[in-house]
């Protein structure tokens, strides 16, 4: 009987843990940049995405161009989507290592861009 109760409690605990994980808000970093060479910039961002994957970091990078944005039309936006702020901190730490592939790619990216805006957004759950 004790094993049945313990098993039931374990199942409830796992269910609650899964529900909590599902409801955790996603964090989105939105970076507006100026770059003279969008094609090279996109290539370096794609390289960085692959390096994050190799490192096992759950990061999704996307490059956007504003098309209906008034005076900001044409602005290049990079979004960095991570599960939470703790993961974002791990990503920043990994990027700061100068002798790593991630650090080398960031140096190349920094050389061909100027950041004009940098914001963090947290997903609102319905």
What do these predicted ranges mean?
Residues 32, 79-81, 119-122:
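Soluble periplasmic/extracytoplasmic beta-strand elements of cell-envelope proteins
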């Amino acid at each position: 009987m004790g094993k049945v109760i313990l098993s039931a409690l374990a199942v409830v605990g796992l269910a609650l843990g899964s529900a909590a994980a599902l409801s955790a808000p996603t964090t989105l970093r939105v970076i507006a940049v100026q770059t003279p060479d969008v094609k090279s910039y996109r290539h370096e961002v794609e390289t960085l995405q692959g390096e994050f994957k190799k490192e096992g970091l759950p990061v999704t990078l996307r490059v956007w161009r504003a098309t209906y944005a008034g005076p900001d039309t044409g602005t290049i936006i990079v979004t960095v989507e991570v599960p939470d702020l703790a993961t974002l901190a791990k990503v920043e730490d990994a990027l700061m290592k100068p002798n790593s592939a991630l650090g080398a790619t960031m140096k190349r990216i920094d050389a061909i861009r100027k950041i004009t805006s940098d914001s963090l957004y947290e997903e609102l759950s319905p």
